[in-house]
Amino acid sequence: MLFANLWKAIILGIIEGITEWLPISSTGHLILVDEFIKLDLSKDFMEMFNVVIQLGAIMAVVILYFHKLNPFSPKKNGEEKKDTWILWSKVLVACLPAAVIGLKFDDYLDAHFYNFLTVSIMLIVYGIAFIIIEKRNKNVAPKCTNLKDFTYKAALIVGAFQVLALIPGTSRSGATILGAILIGASRFVATEFSFFLGIPVMFGASFLKIFKFLAKGNTFGSEEIIILITGSIVAFVVSIIAIKFLLNYLKKNDFTVFGWYRVILGAILIGYWLFS
C-alpha cells in the first residue's frame, strides 16, 4: 500500500511543481487528479496534503532567489539591503487581503468550492481573462518594468486579486499576475512579484492546514510523513525547472497559450462532468 501511495504522491508532486508557477492553478489540478488517482488515505489528510505539498514548491523560489530576497547578505551594500527590506514590506502588504479573508472563510471555501465543477468553471473564466487581457495589451508598453518601481498601492491591489485565488481553479499565480498586468506591470515584474508573494502566503496556508488537521484529532503516521515529504521533494525539484522555463518563455512570449490551455481543459472537464 505504501508503494502505491508513494508513486501517486510523486505524480502529485510533479503536477504541483509544474502548475504552481504556471498560471493554470495547482490546487485545481490536484483536485482534478484526485478524481482519477486517489491515495488510500483519509479525506482530512488529502485536503491538508494538497496545500502543504506547496512548501516544496515555494522552497524552489527561496533557493533560486535567495540572494535577491536576503536582506542580510554580506554581498549587498546598504542601499541594496534597504531595497530588499522595501521589497519584503510590499510583499507583506500584498498578503493582507488574502490573510484576512482566508482565515475567516477557509472552512467555508473548503466545504463549498473544493470540487470538480468549480475548478472546471474557474479554469475557463480566467483562461478567457488571460486571452482578452493579452490581446488588449499586445501593443501597449508596460508602465512598470522594474520591481523597485512597484508601489505599495500596486502591491495592495495585487493582494486583492490574490483573494480571488481562494477559489480552486483560479490560480494564485494567475490571479496575481493578471492583477499586476492590469495596473501596468510588465509580464516579468508581475511574474516575479507573484513568486515572492507566494512565500509568506503558502507558508501561512500550509501551517494553517497542518494546525487544522491536528486540531481535528488527526495524527501523522510514518506512512503519511513519508508521503508528504516525498511529494514535497518532487514538487521542489520540478518547481526549479518550471520557474526557469517560465522566466525564459516570457522573454519572447505572453500568457495567451496558458489562457487557451485553461479554456480547453475546463471545457473538456465540464463535458466529462456532464456525461460521466
From Swiss-Prot:
Major enzyme class: hydrolase
Membrane-protein topology: Multi-pass membrane protein
Compartments reported by the entry: Cell membrane
GO cellular component assignments: plasma membrane
Keyword match Cytoplasm: no
TM regions (residue ranges): 45-65, 85-105, 113-133, 150-170, 188-208, 225-245, 255-275
MF (Gene Ontology): undecaprenyl-diphosphatase activity
This protein's UniProt keywords: Antibiotic resistance, Cell membrane, Cell shape, Cell wall biogenesis/degradation, Hydrolase, Membrane, Peptidoglycan synthesis, Transmembrane, Transmembrane helix
Main location: membrane
Entry EC number(s): 3.6.1.27
Top-level division of the source organism's lineage: Bacteria
Protein's UniProt keywords contain Signal: no
Role summary: Catalyzes the dephosphorylation of undecaprenyl diphosphate (UPP). Confers resistance to bacitracin.
Homology family: Belongs to the UppP family.
Further comment found in the protein's record: Bacitracin is thought to be involved in the inhibition of peptidoglycan synthesis by sequestering undecaprenyl diphosphate, thereby reducing the pool of lipid carrier available.
PANTHER family linked: UNDECAPRENYL-DIPHOSPHATASE
UniProt-recorded name of the protein: Undecaprenyl-diphosphatase
